[in-house]
Amino acid sequence: MKHLFKLDPAKNLPMNDLTKLVHSGTNGFIIGGTDNVQIEAVQKLYELLGETDLPIFLEISNESMILPEADHFLIPVVLNTENSKWTHGLHQELIKEMGAFIPWKRVTAEGYVILNKDAKVAHLTEAKTDLTDEDIVAYARLAENIFHLPIFYVEYSGMYGDPEVVRKASAALSNTKFWYGGGIRSKEQAAEMAKYADTIIVGNIIYEDLEKALETATIFRKKTV
């Protein structure tokens, strides 16, 4: 997967726009949000996407995101925080409550590094965002070699990141997949980050300028003879 659209269930998106996203050339969708997420909205969005053959991932930020019938669950593990609530605390509580019913084969953990100090998610998780390139590379190696996480996700959350940071962190990984999200608002930015990331995630621009969002996916569309 080179490209995923991230949809916020707390935001409205017309069905016609959703159809355009499905046929844009993207490789799939993440449904996720930081706040004001209601299970009814999650279910409605999931059902609207249900007829596509593209993978749909539910990124679980809180219990209100849990939809038992979902095919894929993403579990964020925030690496650059000293608040254990976001590295394993909430995770342990949920497993204690629901462990016997969790479909583990459909669950994938993501090692998150959040780098936009002004983002809601940075404030919520108390993320330490003033990191050097060396810090971020070390987190990448931690994710792969100590925690054996399948995904290392660098999240600039609304702000376009530093391609050099992405290049260095990606180069430090051998087996863990590198995902990049944050501030992609043009096909040029999409192409730039895709040079280094295994997968790029495009979110906010969907709700700001749909046509530009679509352009970020069309560059990955398979050409037919």
UniProtKB/Swiss-Prot annotation:
HAMAP family for the chain: GGGP_HepGP_synthase
Q: Which family does it belong to?
A: Belongs to the GGGP/HepGP synthase family. Group I subfamily.
Q: Which residues bind sn-glycerol 1-phosphate?
A: 6, 153-158, 183, 203-204
Q: Which InterPro entries does the UniProt record give?
A: GGGP/HepGP_synthase_I, GGGP/HepGP_synthase_sf, GGGP_HepGP_synthase
- The name on file for this protein is Heptaprenylglyceryl phosphate synthase
Q: Any keyword Lipid biosynthesis?
A: yes
Share what the entry says about its subunit structure, partners included. Homodimer.
Protein's GO biological process: glycerophospholipid biosynthetic process
The highest taxon in the source lineage is: Bacteria
Its biological purpose is as follows: Prenyltransferase that catalyzes in vivo the transfer of the heptaprenyl moiety of heptaprenyl pyrophosphate (HepPP; 35 carbon atoms) to the C3 hydroxyl of sn-glycerol-1-phosphate (G1P), producing heptaprenylglyceryl phosphate (HepGP). This reaction is an ether-bond-formation step in the biosynthesis of archaea-type G1P-based membrane lipids found in Bacillales.
Q: Name one GO molecular function term.
A: heptaprenylglyceryl phosphate synthase activity
Recorded hits in Pfam families, A to Z, give: PcrB
What reaction does this enzyme carry out catalytically? sn-glycerol 1-phosphate + all-trans-heptaprenyl diphosphate = 3-heptaprenyl-sn-glycero-1-phosphate + diphosphate
UniProt-listed Enzyme Commission number(s): 2.5.1.n9
Which EC class does it fall in? transferase
Q: Where does Mg(2+) bind?
A: 8, 34
